[in-house]
């Protein structure tokens, strides 16, 4: 069975690492119960882990009205570590905040998915998060693939960034096209194209060349689902599978709210 998770963004799911873990494990428990026994692939939406940067933050940060305000307060709360990263790597304050919080944020984000993969014997594409690449100053929108043994066997970085991910927003880095690869699984070869990447023919073409059979498109959208948006979305997974016959199947989970 393949499960596609549409998840509504709720602040209370990120307040602590325990609340995030409870949310993920609850979703996985329900999916396994509905699926019964047998092979299981679960795909979560884009940026599901990015908001883990706020987990375990003091109440004064959570009292802010918007994510932008809370992020600014978090930056000031971590001013010393942020300044250190800015000086060492010569990066923006936003990038420096991701670097300063990288190790804890990745732990909070990935641990529940690893535990869930093992407990429920599932392959999981854990949506995505803004993650540091090793010990470099590079931060990508990254989608991890996890096996039922709890091994993170692959991390796909996003190639084409939307405006809020670029320098004036989250200050993420676009990945080169040659970072795109396919992942072998019992369900067939998985090709992960994070949100906007699935709209781009060069990304889908590379996945085809690498033998991908299932297109995985973790997405996030906080805009109204109006007529234009619905029509425009047909240019991604739908076009790849129905119109162009590039893949046998596509999975497109969405983070909303």
Predicted regions: what is each one?
Residues 109-125, 195-257:
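CN hydrolase (nitrilase-like) catalytic-core segments centered on the catalytic cysteine
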Residues 2, 26-60, 82-87, 93-101, ...:
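Active-site beta-strand/loop signature of hydrolases that rely on acidic residues for catalysis
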Residues 67-191, 246-257:
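Catalytic-core segment of enzymes that process non-peptidic bonds
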Residues 25, 174-182, 188-202, 231-232:
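A Trp-anchored, charged/polar loop motif used as the substrate-binding/catalytic surface
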Residues 12, 50-54, 133-136, 224-225:
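Short catalytic/ligand-binding loop motif for oxyanion handling, primarily in non-cytosolic enzymes
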Residues 54-69, 145:
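Aromatic- and acidic-residue-enriched segments that line the glycan-binding/catalytic groove
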Residues 1-17, 155-157, 188-197, 216:
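Active-site-proximal beta-strand elements of phosphoester/diester hydrolases
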Residues 16-30, 103-111, 229-240:
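Well-ordered, non-membrane alpha-helical segments in soluble/globular domains
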């Amino acid at each position: 069975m393949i499960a596609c998770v549409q998840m509504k963004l709720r602040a209370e799911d990120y307040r602590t690492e325990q609340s995030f873990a409870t949310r993920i494990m609850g979703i996985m428990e329900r999916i396994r119960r509905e699926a019964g026994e047998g092979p299981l692939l679960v795909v979560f939406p884009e940026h599901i882990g990015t908001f883990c940067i706020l987990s375990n933050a003091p109440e004064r940060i959570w009292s802010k009205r918007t994510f932008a305000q809370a992020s600014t307060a978090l930056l000031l709360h971590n001013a010393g570590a942020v300044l250190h990263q800015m000086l060492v790597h010569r990066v923006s304050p936003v990038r420096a905040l991701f670097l300063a919080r990288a190790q804890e944020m990745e732990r909070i984000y990935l641990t529940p998915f690893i535990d869930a993969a093992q407990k429920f014997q599932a392959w999981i594409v854990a949506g995505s998060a803004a993650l540091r690449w090793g010990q470099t100053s590079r931060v990508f929108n990254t989608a991890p693939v996890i096996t039922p043994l709890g091994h993170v066997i692959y991390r796909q970085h996003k190639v084409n960034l939307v405006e809020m991910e670029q320098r004036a927003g989250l200050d993420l880095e676009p990945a080169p096209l040659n970072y795109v690869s396919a992942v072998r699984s019992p369900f067939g070869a998985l090709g992960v194209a994070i949100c906007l990447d699935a709209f781009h023919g060069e990304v889908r073409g590379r996945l085809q060349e690498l033998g991908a059979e299932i297109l995985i498109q973790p997405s996030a959208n906080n805009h109204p689902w109006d007529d234009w948006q619905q029509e425009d979305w047909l240019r991604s997974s739908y076009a790849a599978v129905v119109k162009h016959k590039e893949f046998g199947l596509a999975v497109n989970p969405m983070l909303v709210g």
